[in-house]
Curated annotation (Swiss-Prot):
This is Urease accessory protein UreE. SMART domains: UreE_N. Involved in urease metallocenter assembly. Binds nickel. Probably functions as a nickel donor during metallocenter assembly. Belongs to the UreE family. GO terms for biological process: protein folding; protein-containing complex assembly; urea metabolic process. The lineage of its organism: Bacteria, Pseudomonadati, Pseudomonadota, Gammaproteobacteria, Enterobacterales. The gene is ureE. InterPro entries: UreE, UreE_C_dom, UreE_N, UreE_N_sf. One of its GO terms (molecular function) is nickel cation binding. Its main location: cytoplasm. Keywords: Chaperone, Cytoplasm, Nickel, Nickel insertion.
């Protein structure tokens, strides 16, 4: 079996590809099937979030596998009003929802309860099968993400 052990900082030309949803792209140790049908094992550093376009390599540097972000069931919010998008981000962030933020658009894993909440704010929410690339903080390990150290002047409960 092919073992992919590193993400290349400077991507090389891919010799293969693998299409993965976000819940697999956050795992450091997992068995995957490449798009050409071969089995491969991911043996990556913990806390590494794979993004579409990343290139992984084996230890020998003889195989280069490009990561493709799989289409997933996502709720899509499109809005030209930055205030309304900020309001949506605030409420979704308060619920620790993994969120992809782009100019004029938000995506999160489809959830009809969250969809209804945002519709109550007057936002239009649609469903799509699209790649999902959430902000890293939602998935990063403690050394890479949002810390919850509390200081005398700042506190919040979870």
């Amino acid at each position: 079996m092919l073992y992919l052990t590193q993400r290349l900082e400077i991507p090389s030309a891919a010799t293969a590809s693998v299409t993965l949803p976000i819940d697999v792209r956050v795992k450091s140790r997992v068995k995957v099937t490449l798009n050409d049908g071969r089995e491969a094992g991911l043996l990556l550093p913990r806390g590494l979030l794979l993004r579409g376009g990343d290139v992984l390599s084996n230890e020998e540097g003889t195989e280069f596998v490009q990561v493709i972000a799989a289409d997933e069931g996502v709720s899509v919010v499109r809005c030209d009003d930055p205030f309304m998008l900020a309001k949506a981000c605030y409420h979704l962030g308060n619920r620790h929802v993994p969120l992809q933020i782009m100019p004029g658009e938000l995506r999160y894993h489809h959830d009809h309860v969250l969809d209804d909440m945002l519709r109550q704010f007057g936002l239009t929410v649609t469903f799509g099968q699209l790649p999902f690339e959430p902000e890293a903080g939602a998935y990063a390990s403690e050394s890479h993400g949002h810390h919850h150290a509390h200081h005398d002047h700042h506190a919040h409960s979870h």
